[in-house]
Amino acid sequence: MNEFPLHQLANIDVQYEDNHVIVAVKPPNMLSQADKTGDTDILTQLKEYIKIKYNKPGAVYLGLVHRLDRPVGGLMVFARTSKAASRLSAQMREHEMGREYLCVVEGRVKDRFTCIDYLKKNEYLNKVEICDADEKGAQLAMLSGECLARKNGTALCAIRLQTG
């Protein structure tokens, strides 16, 4: 018996699919993968989608190549084979696959900008926080951005991550 009825999978927006990869839209506030909360995640939903669409018995392999934070919506790439997972993961490591975001921010923003900070995970709050470079667990985080439009004290920015 399938874990999810088909009507619950209808909100899965698959943008591209072949024998090696599947690209789908992760809605904002959905997890990328299962966690201890038990909340809905796109990885589990897509495995069920593949199981139903292709009438696959048993467990379905789907490799998680990257994640998006829970509040973030956008395209995610998943590997349908272990070989594709290995190759896509290597592309992510070598920065051959870009990670770009659009965001709306308040306040003044330069036309082009770079942010360099150090981040560490707060396990208790399950969030990442800015910290000093010498703090235990600190990791370098760099991004560049460009302001695309301004209106009423807000700015639409295109962001490109240089680091994970």
Task: List where the protein language model places each region.
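RNA pseudouridine synthases
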Residues: M1-T163
